[in-house]
């Protein structure tokens, strides 16, 4: 998963196809000595960012943040999670984005809701001091199915938003996933007891063997 932060100048008006807003921009700064990078911004029209894209006019400048992929034509295609302009600069101060890496914890079943499904599953990471941090991820829809089916210990990068909730006078952190990337296992030898499927646990030794060099 590639999340880019780019300063852009809009070069054309927004187009809409099949419910998706499409805007062409170029990287800043642009000059005669430098070939600007062409960036295609795409987002659903009913999404908050999609509505903002529709209002952008040619020659407007903005800051765009979101998952990005290159094309064979030398264009970057971004699905922006945040667009910041001079008019909505306060949105940058209110940015809510987490990126967590680690190994998936014990399997968890999908829960059926009225119009979708949700899976709540832990993600664990161990630092150099052998301290393990656990993040309880919540994924909906197609991401829910993926999160429910993968084996414990699967190397994972999760991107989304963090929020808080309270129950019985206790505060909980919630990590709602927008994007998930599952990585291939490291070529390093993983301990035989890295994942105890019978007990549904992931050992910290397994987490330490995961290579997240991208």
Describe the role of every protein-language-model region.
Residues 68, 74, 92-103:
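Surface-exposed, glycine-biased beta-strand/turn segments
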Residues 1-42, 46-52, 85-99, 108-117, ...:
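Acidic, gly/ser/pro-rich intrinsically disordered tails
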Residues 58-74, 154-167:
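Flexible glycine-rich surface loops and low-complexity tracts that mediate binding to linear polymers
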């Amino acid at each position: 998963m590639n999340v880019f932060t780019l300063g852009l100048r809009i070069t054309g008006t927004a187009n809409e196809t099949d419910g998706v807003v499409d805007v062409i921009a170029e990287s800043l700064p642009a000059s005669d000595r430098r070939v600007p990078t062409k960036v295609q911004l795409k987002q659903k029209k009913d999404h908050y960012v999609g509505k903002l894209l529709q209002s952008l006019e040619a020659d407007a400048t903005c800051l765009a943040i979101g998952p990005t992929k290159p094309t064979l034509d030398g264009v970057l295609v971004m699905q922006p999670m945040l667009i910041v302009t001079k008019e909505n600069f306060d949105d940058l101060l209110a940015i809510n984005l987490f990126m967590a890496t680690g190994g998936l914890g014990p399997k968890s079943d999908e829960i059926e809701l009225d119009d979708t499904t949700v899976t709540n599953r832990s993600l664990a990471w161990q630092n150099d001091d052998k301290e393990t941090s656990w993040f309880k991820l919540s994924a909906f829809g197609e991401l829910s199915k993926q999160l429910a089916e993968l084996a414990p210990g699967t190397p994972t990068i999760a991107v989304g938003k963090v929020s808080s909730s309270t129950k019985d006078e206790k505060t909980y952190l919630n990590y709602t996933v927008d994007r998930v990337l599952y990585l291939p296992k490291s070529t390093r030898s993983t301990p035989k007891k890295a994942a105890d499927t019978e007990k549904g646990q992931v050992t910290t030794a397994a987490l330490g063997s995961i290579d997240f060099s991208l």
